[in-house]
Amino acid sequence: MSAPKKTYSSTTSAKSKHSVRVAQTTADAALEAVYEMSGDSGDSFDYSKSVGQSAESVPAGAVTAYLQRMQRGGLIQTFGCMVAVEEPNFCVIAYSENASEFLDLMPQAVPSMGEMDVLGIGTDIRTLFTPSSGAALEKAAATQDISLLNPITVHCRRSGKPLYAIAHRIDIGIVIDFEAVKMNDVSVSAAGALQSHKLAAKAITRLQALPGGDIGLLCDTVVEEVRELTGYDRVMAYKFHEDEHGEVVAEIRRMDLEPYLGLHYPATDIPQASRFLFMKNRVRVIADCCASPVKLIQDPDIKQPVSLAGSTLRAPHGCHAQYMGNMGSIASLVMAVIINDNEEDSRGAIQRGRKLWGLVVCHHTSPRTVPFPLRSACEFLMQVFGMQLNMEVELAAQLREKHILRTQTLLCDMLLRDAPIGIVSQTPNIMDLVKCDGAALYYGKRFWLLGTTPTENQIKDIAEWLLEYHKDSTGLSTDSLADANYPGAHLLGDAVCGMAAAKITAKDFLFWFRSHTAKEVKWGGAKHDPAEKDDGRKMHPRSSFKAFLEVVKRRSLPWEDVEMDAIHSLQLILRGSFQDIDDSDTKTMIHARLNDLKLHGMDELSVVANEMVRLIETATAPILAVDSTGMINGWNAKIAHVTGLPVSEAMGRSLVKDLVLDESVVVVERLLYLASQGEEEQNVEIKLKTFGTQTEKEAVILIVNACSSRDVSDSVVGVCFVGQDVTGQKMFMDKFTRIQGDYKTIVKNPHPLIPPIFGGDEYGYCFEWNPAMEALTGWKHDEVVGKLLVGEIFGMEMMCCRLKSQDSMTKFMISLNNAMDGTNTDKFSFSFCNREGKFVEALLSTNKRTNADGVITGVFCFLQIASSELQQALTVQRATEKVAIAKLKELAYIRQEIKNPLCGITFTRQLLEDTDLSDDQKQFLDTSAVCEQQLQKVLNDMDLESIEDGYLELDTAEFEMGTVMDAVISQGMTTSREKGLQIIRETPREISTMRLFGDQIRLQQVLSDFLINAIRFTPSSEGWVKIKVVPTRKRLGGNVHVMHLEFRVSHPGGGLPDELVLEMYDRAKGMTQEGLGLNMCRKLVRLMNGDVQYVRENAQCYFVVYVELPMAQRDDAASQM
């Protein structure tokens, strides 16, 4: 046997991928050189043969020259003209030969010298257009990313001819491509991407409405939508595989055209240089491949040809134009599809980047162009497609890993009964672990073969070859045994090309085998008739397919990372477990150990299941579940509280027929159907009916996530809904909308009740940036207004507020477009970097902006965030998390035991309410009722982190301040009487009837806690504790008023211990129970836009609580915005 030269593994590490791309670039350069030589010599260019020979070495200089020609060819297409200018003076440094004619500078008759416009090196391009057009070019050049304003509509100075100016920056200035505006073009009234993106709104809506889990359907849909948008004869989705070759995975075409669906193409068909250009300029249009290109004239002082990498007019290479002509395609439009790419670097760390997944390719049998705004809309559609595709790719990977894990579990279970023979002799077996054509176990000099494999002697020979030439390795994976230099590869034929081998003992192996790639190819078009004599030497899709088959005839599909991980995991389980086939003691020990692990795992599963049930029952989020027939079989305490329907009455009722409002029936039925198919919807709004004490509310509004419930056989047996109660917020927003006054006065008000708000006009320019946004971002109103929301303010690079990822920007753009189309987006995750470089985590809601006639004129954006102080305190609070968890079980028991007698108290009170009572007795019962509600709310506070982090959803409802004061004082009466103290109540008369909007129960909770702490630390001899309320009415603007309330709880004596006060302010090292209560109350007050102070004076101490709440009554009728 000869020593191996090199092993080609199917690994997809970053280093390996880079090596493959470098090698492919060399092959591209070699193929191009052969093509150029054939043209010079007059010989014919044999494409199929040249592809096979392109792997030969090429000088580095030749590769560099090839890459330069691809980007700096000096030729453009005829459907426009190009001018390159210097910054900032706009002096011309290069232009196309057709520019003077295209810009209407060629005289129709002999003009006077004063009327002549001349285009030449050094000309100020602005002088060739109208003054407003020149100003538009200047404005675009002043932006950081000039391409965001494309297309810029300009008019020639002499003729008034309208043109699209499409600009981008290069190393020496600005390149401007000019295209004609045709009368039948879709109207775009202003510069900028947002206007163009509206053209793709319907297509984007359809893509987003597709069910998940079907990449084929997603690809089919996108080609249909692109064809409807552009009108090309053929539209294809073209996917790049791991080995860089391509495949048509979706196609829609004119019926008389030959189908290409299913065809595979060699990697050289789309050169690496072209792929690089697609990453930079994501839309490529060729109007007429038969047209003669136009040359560029440039300043002789420029050292190298002007870069056309980003130009929309860059002429096609002669090789590509010939390919198009041979296939009968005269015009094309190609769009890049880019997704996330997670690669491991040399240290094993994950590097998150972007990669070219493939292309969407449009062909037309006659010359054709689509206007730039429509091309821009298609580019945005590709961003959305890429984002959807990325989710599908990740989901498919997760499902594949899940399948592998399930198979591994079954194989491990087989080891308990018959190791290691069970993994090849039973079902499932090792062939089910990864995709393969055959597998084998070589163990103790015996063979177990499955599927298509080499013979026993050949497997023995492979094992000996591995032991001799790869003795230091635990295995080998390759897509070509021939390229891995296995001497007997030629004897295996096409049936066995690829192999993955795993060493399980010093001399024993597991093998997986794959046949050649051509076997896997699914030919979707008409199969080639051997009687038809195609000229394989011509460049054509069929000859490309022939070349592809030639390239891969000795190769299998590559082994994916996830497959190799699965093989390696099984190898680790087996290696060392069976050193000798007769070592029965070892086998017995392993069996016992695996059985113990299995039993231990079952115990842990039981514990986890019980804990999950407890968490669901006690969760502060409303949770309900139904069985496969739609009947309620889960109804936790929170949803029982918000709906007023007890658990006992909810169980067994129909969700759709009995509990859902009519307007939500269709939505819920769709959720149930999709979940029964395993498709889990998220963030869906549903409305439930109310019962009992909650009937005063029209409905309970929940934002729910649906989760499919499965049995041990993975069958869907029900659906669980985890919700967020947004009823109070919706009611408050509705009422606040009705009572809001002058818009400017409210939005511009620095009051803490006003959230961060920004807005964009119909062209995407920022017109609003309120004080709260200034404080949040660090960017002032005057610094951002007039800039583009996407690209200049929010973007990926040197923008005011840098976003986390490209997907984040795409989602932001989708939400803006949806709002402009009349569809609001509610609370999606939105993270950006502020001026100080700190990331802000927020929830973004977008709403349409309309004028008096109801016409949409822009978009309003609202952010919800936690306060900066709470964010800073987050780290400190999380340090106590472990201690809190330890106490959680104890608290859960106490909470549960309190609920039963509380239900008895509530029942007794309800009985008394039905009797004849005096006014005083009715007031006593009202006070008792709100105290019960406060106790119930405290019992449901299982997740203190939501309070600590500032994300707790406060209830918002109308309430009477007098009821709050009665409840607060009643809670302090027992303790005060025991200590012989008198509670003095000092409140203005209007407090008893004052009606406000807010969370009544939380307000009385914090006030009662401060009052009881004051009583607790007042000496009995002093004799009193006083609570005083000072209301101050404030006008926000227009007719909107808030009530500023100052509560002062004062008491004589030395006051609270210093340590307890420090705990309230998060400044203590530890936390007592009393301190935790005060700390939570202070955070609740801050959630109400207030604060708490504890003041010590000579004779007394006091809590001062400041709160501001909207008033529920106004002096006059509300005016509309």
UniProtKB/Swiss-Prot annotation:
Database matches in CDD domains: HATPase_Phy-like, HisKA, PAS
PROSITE patterns: HIS_KIN, PAS, PHYTOCHROME_1, PHYTOCHROME_2
Domain Histidine kinase: 893-1113
Post-translational modifications: Contains one covalently linked phytochromobilin chromophore.
Keywords: Chromophore, Photoreceptor protein, Receptor, Repeat, Sensory transduction, Transcription, Transcription regulation
GO biological process, one term: red, far-red light phototransduction
Ranges for domain GAF: 214-393
Cell wall biogenesis/degradation as UniProt keyword: no
Family: Belongs to the phytochrome family.
Role according to the record: Regulatory photoreceptor which exists in two forms that are reversibly interconvertible by light: the Pr form that absorbs maximally in the red region of the spectrum and the Pfr form that absorbs maximally in the far-red region. Photoconversion of Pr to Pfr induces an array of morphogenic responses, whereas reconversion of Pfr to Pr cancels the induction of those responses. Pfr controls the expression of a number of nuclear genes including those encoding the small subunit of ribulose-bisphosphate carboxylase, chlorophyll A/B binding protein, protochlorophyllide reductase, rRNA, etc.
Protein name in UniProt: Phytochrome 2
The organism of origin for this protein: Ceratodon purpureus (Fire moss)
Gene behind this protein: PHY2
